[in-house]
């Protein structure tokens, strides 16, 4: 009896605003895989529709990724390939996907990254700041005590450039926080 070959888990970056930024390799992989695991299937259907991709689309978001990981692992053990995509940018960069990758590695399933857009790297590249050393922190904390802890870390004399994500709804509260704390920072805000 032949041993069944396992599928592959692809981590595919998606555009961060312009669907024409999707790489040809990313399009090919999304076309070829058996299942696309998407952060938000409604938003992903828009991109996939523009790219004329009609593969099986399933949700994989922060509220279900632990439960769905087992399902996707079983599918890959049965020989199917799965691609993880996020609403915009690279999966696992402040988006779901880490749990599935961890489970894939633990189960000996091959994981392949398909590079493309990453909002943090794109913003850093146009900031004009020294990028010989930078730290991506994810989303800026919401609570004042946590914000102060992060600001203290930044003030310790480290010369690294810090990059944070923030929602448009909260950006002004972050700027107000820096002003109130007399942070004396150079800021680059990107959308």
Task: Walk through the language-model features, giving the residues of each.
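Short active-site oxyanion
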Residues: 30-36, 108-112, 161-162
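Conserved helicase motor
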Residues: 59-66, 139-144
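Short glycine-cluster motifs
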Residues: 77-141
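Glycine-rich, flexible N-terminal cofactor/catalytic loop recognition
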Residues: 1-63
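Alpha-helix capping/helix-boundary segments
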Residues: 42-44, 89-90, 119, 170
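Short phosphate-binding loop-to-helix
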Residues: 62-77, 96
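Beta-strand/loop-alpha-helix module characteristic of Rossmann-like adenine-cofactor folds
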Residues: 2, 6-7, 118-191
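Short glycine-rich anion-binding loops that position phosphate/pyrophosphate groups of nucleotides
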Residues: 16-18, 87-91, 168-170
């Amino acid at each position: 009896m032949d041993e069944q070959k396992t599928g592959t888990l692809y981590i595919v970056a998606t555009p961060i605003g312009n669907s024409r930024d999707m790489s040809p390799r990313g399009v090919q992989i999304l076309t070829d895989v058996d299942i696309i695991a998407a952060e938000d299937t409604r938003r992903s259907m828009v991109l996939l529709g523009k790219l004329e991709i009609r593969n099986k689309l399933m949700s994989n978001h922060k509220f279900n990724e632990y439960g769905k990981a087992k399902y996707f692992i079983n599918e890959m053990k049965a020989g199917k390939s799965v691609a993880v995509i996020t609403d915009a940018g690279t999966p696992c960069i402040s988006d779901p996907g880490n749990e599935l990758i961890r489970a894939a590695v633990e189960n000996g399933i091959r994981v392949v990254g398909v590079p493309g857009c990453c909002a943090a790297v794109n913003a850093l590249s146009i900031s004009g700041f020294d990028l010989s050393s930078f730290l991506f922190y994810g989303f800026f904390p919401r609570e004042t005590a946590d914000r102060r802890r992060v600001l203290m870390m930044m003030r310790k004399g480290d010369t690294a450039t810090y990059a944070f994500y923030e929602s448009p709804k909260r950006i002004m509260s972050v700027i107000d926080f820096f002003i109130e704390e007399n942070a004396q920072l150079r800021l680059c805000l990107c959308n």
